[in-house]
Amino acid sequence: MFYWLIDLSNTVPGLSIFKPMLNVFRYITFRTGGAMVTGALFVFLFGPWIIDNLRLRQGKGQPIRADGPQSHLVSKKGTPTMGGLMILSGLVVSTVLWANPLNPYVWIVLAVTLGFGFIGFYDDYLKVTKQTHAGFAGRTRLLLELLIALAACYALIRLGREPFSTALVIPFFKDVVVDLGWFFLAFGAFIIVGAGNAVNLTDGLDGLAIVPVMIAAASFGMIAYLAGNAVFADYLQINYIAGTGELAVLCGAVLGAGLGFLWFNAPPASIFMGDTGSLALGGMLGSIAVAVKHEIVLAVIGGLFVLEAVSVIVQVASFKLTGKRIFKMAPIHHHFEQLGWTEPQIVIRFWIISVMLALAGLSTLKLR
């Protein structure tokens, strides 16, 4: 919305005197900062009202796993879920205000985010109303996620330039590109769905998921800005993708809304993100990675999410094949709880790991 002030200053005679001042809205960096501040303020202001309403409507709050750590049955009982609504509301408001409304990449990523958010919301709704940890049928949920992801990947392919639109870029090497053809649809959908569910699995302790999400969003905001700038892309020898720089504004909005949410989600949490938030934010990260052609780098920057997802896969596979469990409990953050680590220890140490992985992922921009 604010982006249109530039055009108004050119077309409305009375606003021409403000043109030098309004010119700042041309800059993605300025609008990214504005989106970040707006997202944070929105969640700070409306967060208490949203939490009170969710607590009133949900009654007993999110059901706690009976087979999980016993401390959770006491410390987390009665805490409302669906806190992702706070983040998504801040994200949408900030994006509408600060992003270029004519940029198709913005709307594709936003569509994936809200689509996954709706799936997560329905999953949370079933869990709360039925007071069971089992929500949406797994296959149905996965099918809906795949449909959204496939539609987004198809739109991204149509936006890109051939044959690069279906290419997989290999980091660390200059100009090493593998054209996947239409198989890129399946690959891109796998990245988006995988990211959504990996973040979902990570969201098991107070503050554990939101900070790594913010770190990843900040990292991909930088990558999107650089990939969407012809000068920087040429200097760093990364592929230039016109228009993707605008995705930095979305990342700024997530960073701000995430900071606001963390205020209420810090231990002991007043609200949980729920599948509403974790699925949506993971899907957003996956779709941005596909849009800017840094899918492999997402596995590095989001390595913590990968670790959480792999721990579940390994645990399930091992138990089905051998009848034995590799970890005391999965996802892996619960394994460390069973080893005696306190919740703050696990959360802060995982944050540190996320920072280190983000730095490693960003370093690939220069290692060519």
UniProtKB/Swiss-Prot annotation:
GO cellular component: plasma membrane
Transmembrane is among the record's keywords: yes
Cofactor: Mg(2+)
Record key words, sorted: Cell cycle, Cell division, Cell inner membrane, Cell membrane, Cell shape, Cell wall biogenesis/degradation, Magnesium, Membrane, Metal-binding, Peptidoglycan synthesis, Transferase, Transmembrane, Transmembrane helix
Pfam families: Glycos_transf_4 (PF00953), MraY_sig1 (PF10555)
Database matches in InterPro entries: Glycosyl_transferase_4 (IPR000715), PNAcMuramoyl-5peptid_Trfase (IPR003524), PNAcMuramoyl-5peptid_Trfase_CS (IPR018480)
TM ranges: 32-52, 79-99, 102-122, 140-160, 176-196, 207-227, 247-267, 271-291, 296-316, 345-365
Similarity comment: Belongs to the glycosyltransferase 4 family. MraY subfamily.
Function of the protein: Catalyzes the initial step of the lipid cycle reactions in the biosynthesis of the cell wall peptidoglycan: transfers peptidoglycan precursor phospho-MurNAc-pentapeptide from UDP-MurNAc-pentapeptide onto the lipid carrier undecaprenyl phosphate, yielding undecaprenyl-pyrophosphoryl-MurNAc-pentapeptide, known as lipid I.
Protein name as it appears in the record: Phospho-N-acetylmuramoyl-pentapeptide-transferase
Gene from which the chain derives: mraY
